[in-house]
Structure formats: C-alpha cells, structure tokens
C-alpha cells in the first residue's frame, strides 16, 4: 500500500478523494465536505496526481497585463475600492493613445501575449470606444490577444446602446475580442449579490451572457470572490 493510499484511507474525506482518483466526480454534498475539511495538503496531492495522469508534467501560463480603461462606475459594489462616480476628481477614462501606450509598454518590456481589459460601468462609453480599442490592439499588436469585459460590463454597454447583449458580444468579437473573463460572478447566489452588489446583473443574466459568449465561439471563464458575507453552501 502506497503512502498516498494510506493517507487517503485515514482521511475524513478519503472516500471522495478515492472516487476522484477513479474518475468519479464529487457530488454537491462532497464539495461541501471538501470545503470544510482541513486536509488541504492531501487534496493537493490527489489533485496533482490526477493532473499528471491527464496532462503529464506540462504546465502553461499566459503572460499578460491588466488594463483598467476606466474607473468611472455607477454600480457602487460594496467591496470595491477601485471605482469612482462620474465627475469625481479621481475618475479617469483612458484615451485610445493611452491604451496603445500601455499595451506597447507591456509588449516591449515583457512580450505579453494577452491584455485583460476591464473597468467600471461607465454610462458615457458607447460600443465604438471598445471596438476602436480592440481593433487598434489587434492591428498594432497582432501577437497580443484581447481578453476582455465582464458580463456586467457587456450588459452595461447593451444598456447604453439599447441593444441585446448577444449583439454587443458579436460586434466586440468582430472588433477583435477573443475571450471573456469570469469577473462579475462574485458568488452566483442572488441573496449574496443583493447585499454586496445589488446594482449588478443577477445570477441568471450572468449565466445567460456566458452562454451567449460560447454560442458565438468566445471562450469564457468563471471567477469566485469569497470571504465576505457568503456561506459555504453559497459557494457550493
């Protein structure tokens, strides 16, 4: 019996880990047990073993920069120290030249392969601002991918343009958008979102816009912000 097997058999989450090694995905109750367990090291060992079995020892990463094009926002999320209301003395919106300069610096110094573009919900920015930015980046820096705009930003643009979010996504893709980040999800439980980000889109709209992204051939991800008012059940 290997040392890993012995550790699994003596762990309070051993049954879940053993199932995972055998290709059986955890159920919802299992996820809650994993979240509440302090056997983090063993989880890491098992996760590493599964990863090596599937992909070998190859790893990858994306060398990128985060470009916050504006901090103007009308959403007032409780956890955000970044945003400033419209006309605030510390508010800003980058010009096309400023965006180009930042991407150029990233390319010249670090040979970035991607720029993550995110900002506030600025009601003064129409879709042309984003289209011009994406087209400029893709034309002047063809080796730099455009990974941009949370679902809530996309919804904001649709509101400004009086258009559908799918139409906005389609136009942004045509302009050079290549993938959509997972921001804006926080915790996909509306009772939590109503406390920390009541002016943002709800969970159903977040999921809907992500589905629209996939339908248009735009890969997307999901992020989770935890450690505030959520419970473990909300996370699971």
What name fits each language-model region?
Residues 2-4, 15-22, 73-76, 105-108, ...:
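Short hydrophobic/aromatic-rich motifs at helix boundaries and adjacent loops
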Residues 1-66, 70, 74:
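Flexible, acidic/Gly-rich N-terminal and inter-domain linker regions that tether
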Residues 84-236:
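Conserved Radical SAM active-site core
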